[in-house]
Amino acid sequence: MNVTKPATQRPKLPSVGRLGLVDALAGARLAELGWTEHDDQAHVDLLWSLSRAPDADAALKVLVRLAENPDTGWDELNAALLNERSLRGRLFAVLGSSLSLGDHLVANPQSWKLLRGKVALPSHAALLESFVDLAEEVAAAPASAVHRLRALHRDHVLVLAGLDLAATVEDEPVLPFTVVAAHLADIADAALAAALRLAEKTVCRDRTPPRLAVIAMGKCGARELNYVSDVDVIFVAERADPISIRVAGEMMRVASSTFFEVDAGLRPEGRSGELVRTVESHIAYYQRWAKTWEFQALLKARAAVGDAELGQSYLAALMPMVWTACERDDFVAEVQAMRRRVEQLVPADIRGRELKLGTGGLRDVEFVAQLLQLVHGRSDESLHVASTVDALSALGEGGYIGREDAANMIASYEFLRLLEHRLQLQRLKRTHLLPEFDDEEAVRWLARAAHIRPDGRHDAAGMLREELKHQNVRVSRLHAKLFYQPLLESIAPAGLEIAGRGMTSEAAERQLAALGYEGPQTALKHMAALVNHSGRRARVQSVLLPRLLDWLSYAPDPDGGLLAYRRLSEALATQSWYLSTLRDKPTVGRRLMHVLGTSAFVPDLLMRAPEVIQNYGDGRTGPKLLETEPAAVARALIASAGRYSDPLRAIAAARTLRRRELARIGSADLLGLLEVTEVCRALTSVWVAVLQSALEAMIRANTPEGGRPLARIAVIGMGRLGGSELSYGSDADVMYVCEPASGVTDAQAVKWSTAVAEQVRAKLGTPSVDPPLEVDANLRPEGRNGPLVRTLASYEAYYAQWAQAWEIQALLRAHAVAGDAELGQRFLLLVDHTRYPPDGVSAEAVHEIRRIKARVESERLPRGADPNTHTKLGRGGLADIEWTVQLLQLQNAHEIEALHNTSTLESLDAIAEAKLVAEDEVKLLRQAWLTATRARNALVLVRGKPTDQLPGPGRQLNAVAVAAGWHNDDGGEFLDNYLRVTRRAKAVVRKVFGS
């Protein structure tokens, strides 16, 4: 009797789709292997095992290639796969994770047997023996040496990968990361030993080989190696003779062509130095010439192969120097430079995918561990360990970082290293780059290879994305916390939640000094003041400070920044929004720390205009600091001052809005959000608004109630005010013109207008905590000796008869900025005949300008000033460029209307367009003007007061470089660029002036 199976009963063998196989040929490949012919439990288990491989299709393709190779012994392998779960786990995991190891198995088809049975990792000694024995064997047959040694190396990597990956497919033990990394270093040691033996045979033949020790550095030295990595080495010989050098060179050649790249770039003097040195030569170098990074590199040094006694002598001689490196004068500067160099190595477009150098990546963890080892290791031998994991553990045990934080950092580090291993295994290529996050197939493969499984809310790829985000954020937070939390614990009161073991005050001071603080004792006092009071503020500060202090340590002046933060926090103690904003908006905190740690000018403004801090965040269209238009600020300032009949209150209102706008401009400038031309225009706009407000207030004050002003007054901006090119420290150069009201004589109008103008100058110039508001009218006819205010007719008569060359030159930048606009325009039309005469200015006037310029260069530079670095009057500085432009205007403006312009930069454009000066030379002038203006603005931002002289090398110059928008905080590099740019511009200036 035939029994028909119910239609709903599913076959025991899973379908290709259920197995997750997506290759169109997958079904045919399974059939070719004979795995779909039987539906017994063994075949079902086999197929489900295959489906769990990170890339089951890739694994299946290699299995078919193995089946087709007669040397594989397919029947034996097939039977073993059906019956041995551990073999399935290792083999399928390897074939689904590593295309290169799959190719190795196809080329060496008997190597699958290495994954069979009770597989254990060989010891370091066993590895050395197997590699060296093979080297001895192949030395007589060099033609096969590379192939056989490489196959042995790959076999050992295969076994390790099989054990490392097996848990992704079957319920096999998980190998700890530390075991994997240490075994990879053991394999590397054995490979180096084999290469050394072959090199000795090749170079020395029957002679006794030289005593040569190979010191492993980097990850190999620390026994935390990657699957694919350069192996960094240093060679130490008893005698640095030609034989030793040849052996070392041959060893590198053999190892690099057979196993992995061997790099001796960490040796003294790097690639320019001798390949081999004696112990004594190494000692001499490290005592006299070595940089901080070279001592940092020695943290990982280990005698790997070669002469063991010589290797130990090297370590015994040099390691004590490592633990005193933090006492070197340049230690802090070099550490800060190393931090920045790492950050700048990664292009912005791939930073989020960089496992090693990206934010919250492996280098962040390694840098923390190594810096803290260097700082505290001189007084604590428990920190004398090589690997990152061991270092973090020791730092936790010693109280230098919290134990829980150390455990979390280790967990994040091991997770990121696991991903790095999986990425490298795929093609046995050196890489640290995660796949594009929208590459679903690649992300899914990596997740499965890393044994990440779906959780019900996310598939494996989604889980990996979430885990990466979590780990990067955790590392970034811990990066700050590990440096500063123990410091806070050492100063916090017992009642505060953060109080723990902390570290000694001496250790805390050492650590702060290493992080860039020149006054670590004072810094600790500031930190204590911030957390040593009761209530919510202290608790919030204790949470905020690790991150804020970390950001501050990247600023040019962390000492000044911490003081400014303390002052600001104390001033805003009653403002609940302040700490809440810093807590909830990291962007605000990061930007604020940069500003406080760079500038003395802006923090003083923020103390009295703290609301600007709320605009340090981002809005929907970008930074909130840029949402304010200077023109809108000017209108608001004039309107606010206009509400008061009392001139003092009106000017006070204008000062308040000016203060807020200066804080906004300075902040945006320091944060790199504004171009220098935008800064100059914004500063000019707010100055003009203040002038307008003050003028209106004084006119109201001098006009009887119900009466009318005796005159109309216009304020003419001169110099940089007229050109809309003011800097932070600029005075307002002005002239006043008046026109009598109906029925008022010229004399009455001038007297009344003079009183108004004097009051404007006096009230604005009243000493204040704000940046000064100096009004300078010395560019008026006859200078200080001439009347402060004139009528149009008086100006016309004077300029027609008495105008001197310098007065004509000054008029080139005259522009109506405040007061009666119509009167101002009539004044400009009047002086056009003087500054742009139809036939051009006289040759005598041009000659006089040249003479005055020469006198200015020799007499006006302040005593003691460096002419090369004085931004205003120095070589190729602002005065040089502006005088050059003005000379060309005087000579050519009567023919070229585009030169009727008060802006230096716009006039340079016109000069280039008219080909008065070669275009490349105009570019030099423009670059010098922009460079000097940035530097001059930066000087005020950094020092908090007007100054024109660049400082010498040191912290202040570094801060000026940062404030000027230089791409790093290397003040020397910034200064070199300034000198180069201004020197080239000076050559053009001399050419134009004919000198």
Swiss-Prot record:
PANTHER family: BIFUNCTIONAL GLUTAMINE SYNTHETASE ADENYLYLTRANSFERASE_ADENYLYL-REMOVING ENZYME, GLUTAMINE SYNTHETASE ADENYLYLTRANSFERASE. InterPro entries: GlnE (IPR023057), GlnE_rpt_dom (IPR005190), NT_sf (IPR043519), PII_UdlTrfase/GS_AdlTrfase (IPR013546). This is Bifunctional glutamine synthetase adenylyltransferase/adenylyl-removing enzyme. The gene is glnE. GO terms for molecular function: [glutamate-ammonia-ligase] adenylyltransferase activity; [glutamine synthetase]-adenylyl-L-tyrosine phosphorylase activity; ATP binding; magnesium ion binding. Residues 1-487 are annotated as: Adenylyl removase. GO terms for biological process: regulation of glutamine family amino acid metabolic process. Its EC number is 2.7.7.89, 2.7.7.42. Involved in the regulation of glutamine synthetase GlnA, a key enzyme in the process to assimilate ammonia. When cellular nitrogen levels are high, the C-terminal adenylyl transferase (AT) inactivates GlnA by covalent transfer of an adenylyl group from ATP to specific tyrosine residue of GlnA, thus reducing its activity. Conversely, when nitrogen levels are low, the N-terminal adenylyl removase (AR) activates GlnA by removing the adenylyl group by phosphorolysis, increasing its activity. The keyword Magnesium applies. GO terms for cellular component: cytosol. Pfam families: GlnD_UR_UTase, GlnE. It comes from the Bacteria. The keyword Nucleotide-binding applies. It is an enzyme of class 2 (transferase).
